[in-house]
Design a protein with these regions (language model features):
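Regular, well-ordered alpha-helical segments
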Residues: 31, 39, 46, 58, ...
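Hydrophobic alpha-helical segments typical of transmembrane helices
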Residues: 33-36, 73
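Aliphatic-rich helix starts adjacent to a transmembrane/signal segment
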Residues: 36-53
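Amphipathic alpha-helical protein-protein interaction surfaces
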Residues: 25, 45, 79-82
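N-terminal single-pass transmembrane signal-anchor helix
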Residues: 10-34
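N-terminal leader/signal peptides at the extreme start of proteins
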Residues: 1-12
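Low-complexity, acidic interaction segments enriched in glycine
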Residues: 51-131
Length: 131
């Protein structure tokens, strides 16, 4: 004859307190890691922006060497196949926010250089417009 409830197997698992401790540890780790992750994203945006500006300035210079004048618009660089498409400013997330710098007197064309139209300061401490 069996005794009721005497042979109930011991249940195995985690207690509520153990689960809460683990969740607290995970939350603590996230609060330490999240700011570093966000800073690294900002640094990456600055790096991509600086590289986009460097490449665009080189392309404008190449256009000037080839044609003897500076381009009248960024779209002209695409139309003449110096660019496949206008690059996106990673800070403003738009290809329409570039600030165009005109050449000095005596030069033909309208774009000597360009800057970012993004406001604010990059993680390096420089203004985005000064990159």
């Amino acid at each position: 004859m069996r005794k009721p409830f005497s042979s109930v197997p011991q249940q195995r698992g985690f207690t509520l307190i153990e689960l809460l401790v683990v969740l607290a540890i995970i939350a603590l780790m996230l609060t330490l890691a999240a700011p570093r992750y966000l800073r690294s994203l900002d640094k990456a945006q600055e790096t991509v922006l600086a590289e986009n500006l460097r490449q665009m300035r080189e392309i404008i210079d190449q256009f000037h060497r080839d044609t003897g004048q500076y381009p009248d618009s960024l779209e002209e660089l695409v139309a003449r196949q110096y660019l496949r498409a206008l690059p996106v400013d990673p800070v403003t997330e738009s290809d329409r926010t570039w600030v165009l710098v005109a050449p000095g007197a005596g030069f033909r064309g309208k774009i000597y250089s360009l800057r970012s139209g993004a406001e604010g300061v990059a993680p390096s401490g420089r203004r985005y417009a000064d990159l």
